[in-house]
């Protein structure tokens, strides 16, 4: 469970954020995320759509100096205690990445979602109801979300498989 929480923070948030953010965004968020003072997470999975990012229903609409996000992300590791979230939403139908801070008006997270295993990490829904985020929290370009996502998903998935092998290799059921 702890390995999953660490993986969600270090790879799905920090690594992904680093590669799609600009210098100003890194200066504001990276040091606290690297030190562990802030915990990060990635919001991609949606109720009813899972990881089908092309079917995603979360939207972001530009309104002056802000974007207004509406939608829900589910099964988000570190969603309960996270401070900042790399969230994917559609802008004019194109998948786009945003940084959402827990303090943004209109943002909330659900209670802890109970799980069968991996209890060392929390899981929650991220809820955006007319959530206002600064326009400077756009990560990369509008429509660049799929590129960021695909570039950064394989390393965590490989890491998760290695972590799980390490966990189960101690189980007598998998010994020769």
Question: Where do the PLM segments sit?
Answer:
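Short beta-alpha junctions and helix-cap segments that line functional grooves
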Residues: 29, 56, 72-74, 110-114
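Short Gly/Pro-enriched turn/cap motifs at secondary-structure boundaries
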Residues: 48-51, 75-78, 90, 115-122
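Short loop segments at secondary-structure junctions
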Residues: 20-22, 63-65, 90-94, 102-105, ...
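A structural signal for short hydrophobic beta-strand segments in well-ordered beta-sheet cores
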Residues: 58-61
């Amino acid at each position: 469970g702890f390995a999953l929480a660490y993986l969600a923070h270090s790879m799905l948030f920090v690594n992904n954020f680093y590669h799609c953010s600009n210098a100003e965004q890194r200066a504001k968020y990276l040091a606290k995320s690297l030190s562990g003072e802030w915990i990060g997470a990635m919001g991609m999975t949606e109720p009813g759509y899972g990881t089908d990012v092309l079917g995603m229903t979360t939207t972001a609409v530009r309104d002056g100096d802000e974007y207004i996000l509406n939608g829900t992300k589910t099964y988000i590791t570190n969603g309960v205690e996270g401070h900042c979230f790399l969230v994917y939403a559609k802008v004019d139908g194109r998948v786009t990445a945003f940084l959402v801070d827990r303090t943004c008006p209109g943002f909330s997270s659900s209670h802890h979602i109970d799980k069968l295993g991996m209890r060392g990490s929390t899981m929650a829904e991220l809820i955006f109801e007319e959530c206002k985020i600064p326009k400077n929290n756009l990560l990369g370009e509008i429509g660049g979300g799929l590129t960021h996502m695909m570039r950064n998903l394989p390393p965590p998935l490989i890491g998760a498989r290695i972590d799980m092998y390490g966990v189960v290799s101690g189980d007598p059921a998998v010994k020769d």
